[in-house]
Amino acid sequence: MRLRFYYIPFMRLRTYAVAVSAILVAIALISMGTRGLNFGIDFTGGALVQLEFQQPPVIEEIRSHLSAVGLGDSTIQHFGSDREILVRAPIISDESAAAMELISLIRETLSAQYGDQMDVLRIETVGPRVGGELREQGTYAILYALLAIVAYIWWRYELNFGVAAVIALVHDVVITLGIFSLAGVTFSLPVLAAILTVIGYSLNDTIVVFDRIRENLYIPEGKEKPSIISIINTSITETLSRTILTSGTTLIVVAVLYFFGGEVINGFAFTLLVGIIVGTYSSIFVASLLLVYWRPRYIEPHLKKLQEKPEEVV
């Protein structure tokens, strides 16, 4: 299904797109610089205890009980139903004995107050050294993914297309992380996996648009040569129905996961929900927009080469 009979001047909105992207990126960077990300114990190290009470507990009471035994810096929040509580406490030492002592202290302190009205549902521990290594490896995973993308698009198209795609992907990741920072959503290993998924999904949209742009750059001899902006607008319009269908159906599934999948998968679904929306926007208004601004130096020579060697268009 293609939109054959309509021409939508997307690049007419490029000034507004630049302003919107600049504002969103600035807000994201400021938020990450001031508030930071709410890293889970996967990256910071610590003990996690999930508790279920017979009656909805008061978080301030639980915090008061834990503060009395030196655990005042613990994070306490509802998880799932209003009868379930998640307690996260930092671990200073990498020794397994220290983790077990911390968990025992949490259980004994709360059991003394609530007795058989409380059940322990889940216990997790990650040492601070392991958490730091996971955070470092996660950062490298994103960087390696971006470098691999540049290499692939450089080989498949040209370097300027690869650079434009990576800038758009960095734009997507920064805005997604900024929304995470503003919302205070816990950043865990499943969320990191979702970030990498968003990078791949956004790149897929961008490649579809770039491929159509490259096809439309070739103008048979004797035909009037359209402007670069016109070529890009036409290319985006021709791929728009595909973008709407794929992004729309994926968003429906992700929205169902977010609203009905439960707390365990909530962060993963939230990342995909935000990332797909931002990625769809960037494939239209960011990656293609960079080609418009680079046209005198990069695109015009490419167009000239295609006129001389049309067989290079595959």
UniProtKB/Swiss-Prot annotation:
The keyword Kinase does not apply. Disulfide bonds: none annotated. It is found in: Cell inner membrane. InterPro entries: SecD/SecF_arch_bac (IPR022813), SecD/SecF_bac (IPR022645), SecD/SecF_CS (IPR022646), SecD_SecF_C (IPR048634), SecD_SecF_C_bact (IPR055344), SecF_bac (IPR005665). Keywords: Cell inner membrane, Cell membrane, Membrane, Protein transport, Translocation, Transmembrane, Transmembrane helix, Transport. One of its GO terms (biological process) is intracellular protein transmembrane transport. It is a multi-pass membrane protein. GO terms for cellular component: plasma membrane. SUPFAM superfamilies: Multidrug efflux transporter AcrB transmembrane domain. The chain crosses the membrane at residues 17-37, 137-157, 158-178, 188-210, 250-270, 272-292. GO terms for molecular function: protein-transporting ATPase activity. NCBIfam families: 2A0604s01, transloc_SecF. Part of the Sec protein translocase complex. Interacts with the SecYEG preprotein conducting channel. SecDF uses the proton motive force (PMF) to complete protein translocation after the ATP-dependent function of SecA. Forms a complex with SecD. Part of the essential Sec protein translocation apparatus which comprises SecA, SecYEG and auxiliary proteins SecDF. Other proteins may also be involved. PANTHER family: PROTEIN TRANSLOCASE SUBUNIT SECF, PROTEIN-EXPORT MEMBRANE PROTEIN SEC. Belongs to the SecD/SecF family. SecF subfamily. This is Protein translocase subunit SecF. It comes from Desulfurispirillum indicum (strain ATCC BAA-1389 / DSM 22839 / S5). The gene is secF.
